[in-house]
Amino acid sequence: MKVNPNNIELIISAVKEEQYPKTELSEVALSGRSNVGKSTFINSMIGRKNMARTSQQPGKTQTLNFYNIDEQLIFVDVPGYGYAKVSKTQREKFGKMIEEYITKRENLQLVIQLVDLRHDPTQDDILMYNYLKHFDIPTLVICTKEDKIPKGKVQKHIKNIKTQLDMDPDDTIVSYSSIQNNKQQQIWNLIEPYIS
């Protein structure tokens, strides 16, 4: 699967179902802890530096951001979870918004859950993965920040994350670095069966 980086647009930033775009395209949602690198991952996958706004400050994405990727699929950037400085009310609001999208959106075909390769999955990572499995949503786990781990230890970290998430044997786990930028094609190939 190839995408044209010049044919990508943010369609809408939505907070409720009525605002979701009316389209036939399959959707791939990106979920993960605040600051796990969702926006950086999107930018690196589509070969554009600033399409998805990145921030050093966790918890910046507060809406469901729908990106039309070359008329082939839609990436949906979901607000990050597990950010302590967000108020309880705000967290509940995000939770409702994410739940409504994940449980009701028929276009949703796959969730890419991003976890930090350097650390054990957090309680929130485990809850999110279990939540997706409860609703039988196909999930691709991507371990970000691969460049921060010595090459010889990457597989050990992947195995640890797989074990702690108690991953479904049908789900795939891949390590990724937005800096090394060398696995986009492998990931597009993993996404492709869900959107065709």
Swiss-Prot record:
The keyword GTP-binding applies. GO terms for molecular function: GTP binding; metal ion binding. Residues 24-196 form the EngB-type G domain. GO terms for biological process: division septum assembly. Its cofactor is Mg(2+). Mg(2+) binds at residues 39, 61. GTP binds at residues 32-39, 59-63, 77-80, 144-147, 176-178. It holds the Pfam family MMR_HSR1. Keywords: Cell cycle, Cell division, GTP-binding, Magnesium, Metal-binding, Nucleotide-binding, Septation. GO terms for cellular component: cytosol. Belongs to the TRAFAC class TrmE-Era-EngA-EngB-Septin-like GTPase superfamily. EngB GTPase family. Necessary for normal cell division and for the maintenance of normal septation. HAMAP family: GTPase_EngB (MF_00321). This is Probable GTP-binding protein EngB.
